[in-house]
Amino acid sequence: MALRQIRLENDPILRKKSREVEKIDDRIKQIVEDMFETMYENKGIGLACVQVGMLKRIVVIDMQDEDGKMVLINPKIIEKSEEKQINIEGCLSVPGKNGYVERPKTVVVEYTDLNGNTQRVMGTDYKAHCFCHELDHLDGVLYTDKVLNLSEEEVERLNNEK
């Protein structure tokens, strides 16, 4: 396993669209291991492959919950709720900053696992935010593109209205 360098927000690679993974081989499995090690070392809960400089549609997530460590290869959101929520987000590629972002309250993600099987997972509340945030990276979008200019009180009021 090896730590990889996290690309920062001014790196042009973060604005590029990642490519589908065609074959899950030992190299892909090594990249995934390195991504987890890098994510844990930097105290993150999610990491997209582009954040370590490779344009591959791979995301790793570990929210320390019942789903445990997740590897999502070629993920896509196939369902999302009309109901929205606003939550605070940060990013390992944008250190020292955070901001409020509106995202669907619930999403269903279809992806390929490390064994080549198609899977589906539902994320609600903060997990939905995490899925959307990481999948945005695969399309060259940073959370900072979506930040709302709201106070904490405004966010609480808006979330309670829903």
Curated annotation (Swiss-Prot):
The active site is at E134. Gene3D superfamilies: Peptide deformylase. Keywords: Hydrolase, Iron, Metal-binding, Protein biosynthesis. CDD domains: Pep_deformylase (cd00487). Binds 1 Fe(2+) ion. The keyword Signal does not apply. The keyword Metal-binding applies. Its cofactor is Fe(2+). Its EC number is 3.5.1.88. It holds the Pfam family Pep_deformylase. Fe cation binds at C91, H133, H137. GO terms for molecular function: metal ion binding; peptide deformylase activity. It is an enzyme of class 3 (hydrolase). It catalyses: N-terminal N-formyl-L-methionyl-[peptide] + H2O = N-terminal L-methionyl-[peptide] + formate. GO terms for biological process: co-translational protein modification; translation. Removes the formyl group from the N-terminal Met of newly synthesized proteins. Requires at least a dipeptide for an efficient rate of reaction. N-terminal L-methionine is a prerequisite for activity but the enzyme has broad specificity at other positions. Belongs to the polypeptide deformylase family. This is Peptide deformylase. It comes from Finegoldia magna (strain ATCC 29328 / DSM 20472 / WAL 2508) (Peptostreptococcus magnus).
